Amino acid sequence: MLFYCVLLYGLCLRFLLFSFRYFMCPRLPSSGNRMIGCLLLLLFYSFWLLRCFFIFFLVSCFIYVVEGGGFIDLPSLRYFTRLFYFV
């Protein structure tokens, strides 16, 4: 599952860089619509990447201390945990 998330992140990042290069191209410096479109696209993708970060890293990768899991050894502590994925 982590592989697919990293793959999706890489594809979206490459598409974002391609879109940034296309919209910031100096062929038409007088085109204000191109700059507005670029800013809207960057705003959309930045919020989308932040959303992906919060969903994956802050929700699905938590280790909860629950009944019925495996042992994780810490210095002087032993937790009985299970790893949950919500995505």
UniProtKB/Swiss-Prot annotation:
Question: Matching Pfam families, A to Z?
Answer: Ribosomal_S12
Which keywords belong to this entry?
Kinetoplast, Mitochondrion, Ribonucleoprotein, Ribosomal protein
Cellular component GO terms, alphabetical = kinetoplast; ribonucleoprotein complex; ribosome
User: What broad class describes the main subcellular location of this protein?
Assistant: mitochondrion
What is the annotated localization of this protein?
Mitochondrion matrix, Kinetoplast
Question: Can you tell me which family this protein belongs to?
Answer: Belongs to the universal ribosomal protein uS12 family.
Function, as annotated: Protein S12 is involved in the translation initiation step.
Identification of the protein by name = Small ribosomal subunit protein uS12m
